[in-house]
Regions:
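N-terminal beta-loop-helix "entrance" segment that forms/cooperates
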Residues: 43-49, 55, 194-213
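Early exported N-terminus immediately downstream of N-terminal targeting peptides
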Residues: 29-30, 36, 186-199
Length: 311
């Protein structure tokens, strides 16, 4: 089933926020510039509060400076970001998120100037929503741009005595599994979960399994593991522990694997030796090596590498 693009969803939400904030800021700025006294729209009552700001006797005797500042800081900026996103320019999502932070900083000045009020509070929340949408769009774009093509690894399967087993939601573990199989000539076997793991709902569902350290149902293991001299198991880390589908695989494979090493892929800068020790217990083996790799949106950094041991 074709998955809905999370990037496009976040991008549309961010376009809404940039247009909403941008158009509102332009409207407010025009009211200030057309009537700097603020009397027409009842904004003259705000001027006494501006006197706590630096250079108030010069720039805050009327609303002219405030109008220009609002137009530039929250109006034109957000409309520019919206235009870039409508033109499908990646810079638009980055700027849209940044301008959400700008709005929050703007409102922080209002918190300093004015008594606690509904408008300042709600627009601060709007800024949080805009910044969050911008960050989500940036992350989802990088995730969806990440691809792994098996055809790029021509030596997979050259050595019939080795096997690489992996589970991967986003493709990050798959890439490392293919690289290892291409390096050693191993065949590959993918663990497939019987639960939903794709997309945002899949992320939260997997997090539930990870938090409780439950086993996740997987498709039957239809490969003769004992036929391989050496098996490499590649696993993501879920909530600081072994991924649930890999845990289920290890239980199903107990006593069938003669020799194993592990590759762990995760977001944090850690080694996660606890996951390797858990796989050892479940499989009834002692791993010959462990590689622990930090991955953030497709950028890898090895956090530990153990040389193979003779056992």
């Amino acid at each position: 089933m074709q998955q809905t693009s999370r990037y496009q969803t976040a991008r549309r939400i961010l376009i809404f926020w940039t247009l909403f904030i941008g158009i509102g800021a332009v409207g407010g700025a025009l009211m200030m510039l057309l009537d700097p006294s603020g009397k027409t729209m009842g904004m003259d009552g705000m001027l006494p509060y501006f006197q706590v700001l630096p250079f108030a006797e010069v720039v805050f005797q009327d609303l002219t400076f405030s109008g220009w500042a609002l137009l530039i800081v929250n109006g034109l900026t957000n409309l520019t970001a919206a235009a870039l996103m409508l033109a499908r320019k990646p810079a638009g999502t980055v700027l849209g998120g940044i301008f959400g932070v700008t709005l929050m900083l703007w409102i922080c000045i209002q918190f300093y100037m004015f008594p606690l009020n509904f408008m300042s509070t709600i627009f601060f929340i709007f800024g949080v929503c805009q910044a969050a949408a911008g960050y989500a769009a940036w992350v989802f774009r990088k995730q969806e741009a990440f691809t792994v093509n098996r055809a790029d690894y021509p030596h997979i399967g050259d050595d019939p005595t080795r096997l690489v087993v992996f589970f991967s939601r986003m493709g990050y573990v798959r890439k490392k599994a293919y690289e290892e199989a291409d390096r050693t000539g191993a065949a590959v076997y993918e663990i497939r979960a019987a639960e939903r793991t794709e997309g945002t709902l899949g992320f939260w569902w997997c997090g539930r399994y990870g938090m409780h350290k439950w086993d996740m149902p997987i498709r039957p293991v239809d490969i003769e593991l004992s036929a391989y001299r050496h098996v490499t198991i590649c696993s993501p880390i879920w909530v600081f522990a072994l991924a649930a589908p890999v845990r289920s695989f290890c239980k199903a494979a107990a006593g069938q694997i003669r020799e194993a090493d592990y590759i762990l892929v995760h977001h944090q800068k850690d080694t996660y030796e606890n996951a390797a020790e858990e796989m050892d217990r479940l499989l009834g083996v002692t791993h010959t090596s462990l590689r622990s790799i930090q991955c953030r949106e497709g950028t890898y950094k090895e956090t530990s590498k153990r040389k193979e041991m003779i056992v």
